[in-house]
Amino acid sequence: MKTRFTAPLFGAAIALLSVAVTTQTATAATATKIIFPKGSYCASYSGNFSKSKTYSLYLLKNQDFEVKAANMEDGIHIRDARGVLRGQWIDDNTYRIHTRTKGLHYVTVRSPYGDQQVEFCAY
């Protein structure tokens, strides 16, 4: 017995796929690449974070990546190379992810307090 996709289900699957690709492409287009100074594991960025800012970084499997910033109140989100939100708060100012896959990771930072300094560290 053959199984067939019905047109509505197939159309819905295509629509979901196109939304996912569009969202990831939009994120990639607006992301600022994190660049570490030579010989350093950390890079700092400062500015007004009252609107979300997205950063990108290529990480290898089994790396620890930390984002440090004061008063973020859950304003840090990290998407792994597969687009899955990962990470946890390890103290009041530090959000950490242990990478499961290699690839481009995206960090979104937003603060209700506006001006901030954010530090990114990869080990």
Map each language-model feature to its residues.
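Bacterial N-terminal signal peptides that target proteins for export
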Residues: K2-A13
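Structured catalytic/translocation cores of nucleotide/phosphate-coupled proteins
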Residues: I14-L16, V67
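C-terminal segment of classical bacterial N-terminal signal peptides
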Residues: L16-T25
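Non-catalytic extracellular/lumenal accessory regions of secreted precursors
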Residues: Q24-Q63
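Acidic, Ser/Thr/Pro-rich low-complexity intrinsically disordered segments
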Residues: F49-P112
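Edge beta-strands of jelly-roll/beta-sandwich modules across compartments, strongly enriched
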Residues: Y55, P112-Y123
